[in-house]
Amino acid sequence: MSGNRPIKFRILELFLDGKEYWNYEIVSKIQEEYNMNSAYGRDSINFDIIELASGGMLKDVEQKVDEAGIYKKDFLLHKYVITDFGKARGSDACLRYV
C-alpha cells in the first residue's frame, strides 16, 4: 500500500519485481491507491511514468496503438521495465533492498 509515499516512488516500487508493465496497468493501480480517478489524474500519473523513463529509471520495451480504448483510444501505449539504475534509485529511496 502506498501510504503517503510520493507517486514516483510508488511507481518505482511497483516495477521492482522486474516484470514488464503497460503504462495503463500502472496508471490504474496508482489511480486506485491515490484516489486520482479523473482524466487529469490519469494523465498526470502517465506523465510521471514518462519522466521516470526519460530519467533512465524505466525502459520502454514495447509500444502499440490503443485501438480498444483501454487507456485512451488511438493513443500510443507503452510497456516498461525497470532498469538497473531504477533499481538502485529505488533502493536509495528505501523502497526495497534489491
Model-identified regions with their sequence ranges:
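Short, positively charged loop/turn segments that connect secondary-structure elements
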Residues: 31-47
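Short capping segments at the starts of secondary-structure elements
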Residues: 16-25
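Phospho-regulated, low-complexity intrinsically disordered regions of nuclear gene-regulatory
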Residues: 44, 55, 61-98
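Alpha-helix C-caps/helix-loop-beta hinges
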Residues: 18, 55-56
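Residue-level marker of regulatory loop/turn positions in helix-turn-helix DNA-binding domains and
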Residues: 3-4, 75
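Short, leucine-enriched amphipathic alpha-helices that occur as contiguous helical runs
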Residues: 4-12
